[in-house]
Amino acid sequence: MKKFISILLITVMVILCISACGQKNSSTKEDNHTVQNRGTKIKVVTTIFPEYDWVKEIAGDEISNMDLTMLLDNGVDLHSYQPTASDIMKISDCDLFIYVGGESDAWVDDALKEAVNKNMKVINLLDVLGNTVKEEEVKEGMEAEEEEESGEEEEEPEYDEHVWLSLKNAKTLTKAIADDLCEIDEEHKDIYMRNEKAYEEKLDTLDKEYQGTVDAASQKTLLFGDRFPFRYLVDDYGLDYYAAFVGCSAETEASFETVKFLSEKVDELGLKNVITIEKSDQKIAKTIVENTKDKNQNILTLDSMQSTLSDDVKNGTTYLSVMEKNLEVLKEALQ
């Protein structure tokens, strides 16, 4: 992967150098100019859909004055994404770059070292959240990762990257985005702050609906026949969970022991539903159901927003609309 990124960076730098040679030698005079003084659109690059949608919400009508890019717009999820030379170039001269900051974004550091815009603002979601970021948890019954099976110790803890699935985290992160947009584009500072405040109220309202749903539910445990990227969500509302794999797992095949454990948990807890995430083939979930006593549990899907397409965005999908749909699924799952 590192060799791949190095080749990309060399390619990008050659292209940028050729491009620079054809420009007038005036760039040094505008290094400290604000975006509006340069008369150009604000360039914002995001990696994943939630970041992209948050910028849109904060920008409001000013989105017409932005060149906003979502890199992961073709269904590739965060854990398997590899940037193209075009992606690296977009990052290189943007005004604001927003990324998650976990292990899946290991390529970012090298990309930023070669950035043309030295005044670029960068938001690392995990850094913004600080010590509230959670380590990935291998819970009872989960399929162990290869490193753990071989007895190798990891050099450092692996953090759960799916921080956007907490509405409480979303409030913190949108505030950080708004603050940086205000510094980049002071002319529209009041608009950004007003939009961020209004969006924060929507997040608060939905957060309370989630808590109310959990408080009223008789069932407090979710069981995933799939990867589990919803750690932040369940922790926010005091829910318990079981799952086949951790959130960042690359595994797709569950062992007999894992399926047996999860099937027995369904029976033990009297669960009526087994959950998967978007794009799942549901094979593991179906096998779990087939091995329960009743064999009649529903298979539900929660959307982790890791595979949101540009077409979904064009058709009106937003962060809030996905979280609202997830709430409806949660209501059914907790029956």
Named regions from a protein language model:
Residues 6-9, 21-335:
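Extracytoplasmic metal-acquisition and chelation regions
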Residues 11-15:
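Alpha-helical transmembrane segments
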Residues 16-20:
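C-terminal motif of bacterial Sec signal peptides marking the signal peptidase cleavage site
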Residues 2-4:
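Bacterial Sec-dependent N-terminal signal peptides
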